[in-house]
Regions:
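Feature marking well-ordered beta-strand scaffolds used for ligand recognition
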Residues: 1-178
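Structured catalytic/translocation cores of nucleotide/phosphate-coupled proteins
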Residues: 6-7, 24, 59, 111, ...
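Short, solvent-exposed coil/turn segments
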Residues: 39, 91, 142, 183-185, ...
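Extended, small-residue-rich solenoid/repeat segments and analogous flexible loops
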Residues: 174-200
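Acidic, glycine-rich calcium-binding repeat modules characteristic of RTX/beta-roll
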Residues: 187, 196-261
């Protein structure tokens, strides 16, 4: 068990081991002195994903979200670090919420950017953008200061407080979510279900078929073939130096997303 703290002055994240009786041990630190580009860390959430422990850290001054894997000894390793762009809505981020749904982890973030951003955490600790909500008349999403989110009947209920009057309630329909599947060590077929699948390739040459749901297909280190199928799918391609094929590309351009590592 660890206690986690953020330092505005030093721009670092610290993990403190908790011993018998709640005794606090010597901390380990990760931040600007170790090369992590954060300024004014403002919020942190701890999540579990694929058997690993991660911290999601929001930093107001750098308009960034950092994902840090924490080992059993409390040592920290950065797995992703993303900075707000014109395509996202977390500049000046200071509010952060996470929701777990089965094997999935969803992240909602907001700040001074006139909206909120929805992401999901991939098994390797990277963040994948899913969408966002702009501030519109009748909403209070300007200068977001607090976000709370819960999973209710298969949907994510989000409550956001900001500079505007009132509290904004957003409902995110994630649809039915299937357990995560990982390809085997040999060349083969990995098939999804009718629900929303998270399908992960490995080192072999895999064929990954999503099926009917809104799926996330992540290629592995081999030469892979990805078939999204019906539904609004996301294909994630890594820089592995291998030739990968999205087999149903002509059919999916209008409704699918693509991400390249």
């Amino acid at each position: 068990t660890f206690l986690v703290s953020l330092s505005l002055e030093a721009d670092v994240i610290r993990t403190f081991p908790l011993g018998p009786g709640g005794a606090i041990g010597q901390p380990q630190a990760l931040g600007v002195p170790q090369g992590l580009g954060i300024a004014d860390p403002s919020a942190v959430r701890a999540v579990e994903m694929a058997g690993s422990s991660f911290l999601i850290v929001a930093s107001t001054g750098s308009s960034s979200l950092s994902v840090v894997e924490v080992s059993a000894t409390g040592s920290m390793r950065v797995t992703d670090h993303v900075v707000d762009t014109l395509d996202t809505r977390f500049a000046g981020v200071q509010a952060l919420a996470t929701v777990s749904a089965g094997d999935r982890v969803f992240v909602i973030a907001g700040g001074s950017d006139g909206g909120v951003q929805l992401m999901t955490l991939m098994p390797d600790g990277r963040l994948l953008l899913l969408g966002g909500q702009l501030d519109l008349p009748g909403l209070a999403l300007d200068n977001v200061s607090a976000i709370t989110a819960r999973l209710v009947d298969g949907q994510i209920e989000v409550f956001v407080a900001g500079e505007g009057a009132g509290i904004t309630r957003l409902t995110i329909d994630i649809g039915p979510v299937a357990p995560m599947q990982t390809a085997g060590p040999e060349d083969g077929l990995l098939t999804g279900t009718e629900a929303g699948d998270l399908l992960l390739g490995r080192d072999a040459n895999d064929r990954i078929e999503g099926g009917d749901g809104a799926d996330i297909l992540i290629d592995g280190a081999g030469s892979d073939t990805l078939v999204g199928g019906a539904g609004a799918d996301i294909h994630v391609l890594g820089q592995d130096g291998e030739r990968d094929v999205i087999a149903d590309f002509p059919d999916v351009v209008a409704n699918h997303q693509f991400a390249v590592d």
